[in-house]
Amino acid sequence: MVPAAGALLWVLLLNLGPRAAGAQGLTQTPTEMQRVSLRFGGPMTRSYRSTARTGLPRKTRIILEDENDAMADADRLAGPAAAELLAATVSTGFSRSSAINEEDGSSEEGVVINAGKDSTSRELPSATPNTAGSSSTRFIANSQEPEIRLTSSLPRSPGRSTEDLPGSQATLSQWSTPGSTPSRWPSPSPTAMPSPEDLRLVLMPWGPWHCHCKSGTMSRSRSGKLHGLSGRLRVGALSQLRTEHKPCTYQQCPCNRLREECPLDTSLCTDTNCASQSTTSTRTTTTPFPTIHLRSSPSLPPASPCPALAFWKRVRIGLEDIWNSLSSVFTEMQPIDRNQR
């Protein structure tokens, strides 16, 4: 009986194989009356009865849900042949893989074919196959669809994440604390402003002395520039002008000796040796000043009896200092001497 049942099952599977491939994954088992359930992603289940169109007599009836060991052996022998035949007829579709996925609403690509002997293994495909009382075979007809699904929704590859990591580290390394030099900062352009530690103030040489004979003083000024800065600054942006005031001398200023405009030479010019004495006094009184110092207040002559005259002298000295500072910035403009006005 076992070889006859196996041969009969093989003939029926050969006849019904192409028909099952055209019915979107429906496989008709070689039974006269069998219940077939269709599930296409929704909770709705449709059941109908199909009659195998064969000329078999009614007494040769094959029942798959029988618990007979002979039928189980026949099913086990015909299982590999049926699996190979159905694997050749690949069909696509959607079906629920388990009852849990049916509740979630998630679907699995590929037709999942369950060939079992009892209704429990047919309703729950996740049950343990090949148990003592039942025989179950579960395979995926379309085995390439899961791979295609994976390639269409590829996650971020680890190689790409490692390539993006140095870029993020470079971006983070640019945000450093003030005063520090970032390691991966791009090279600055030649016209860009250098860092504060690279800027140095360089004072220019002193200009010529400007005599103020009526006030008895002389002054000179010098400007400064930022070393390491390419380009030009606007006038007045540096604000590093230095001015030096000293009492005038007859050696450096063409002042009138008779009017005693220079106060340092007044007490020394008492006789004909005034020129030699003034030269000596100039050498002794001229002292070097530091290179960078704050502006000192101009030395004023002894207090005059008229307060208004002393006030306007201070105003004139201040205006002359401003003019000399501006003239040192504009090199083409020469300061105007008071005696030439």
From Swiss-Prot:
Encoding gene, per UniProt annotation: MENT
Any single GO CC term annotated in Swiss-Prot or TrEMBL for this entry: extracellular region
Organism: Homo sapiens
Subcellular location: Secreted
Protein name per the record: Protein MENT
Expression (tissue specificity): Plasma. Overexpressed in lymphomas.
Signal peptide: 1-23
InterPro entries linked to this entry: MENT
Modifications the protein undergoes after translation, according to the UniProt entry: Phosphorylation sites are present in the extracellular medium.
Role description: Involved in control of cellular proliferation. Onconcogenic modifier contributing to the tumor suppressor function of DNMT3B.
Compositionally skewed regions (Polar residues) per UniProt: 127-155
Region (Disordered): 115-196
PANTHER family referenced in this protein's UniProt entry, alphabetically: PROTEIN MENT (PTHR16240:SF2)
Keywords: Phosphoprotein, Secreted, Signal
GO BP annotations listed: regulation of cell population proliferation
Domain of life: Eukaryota
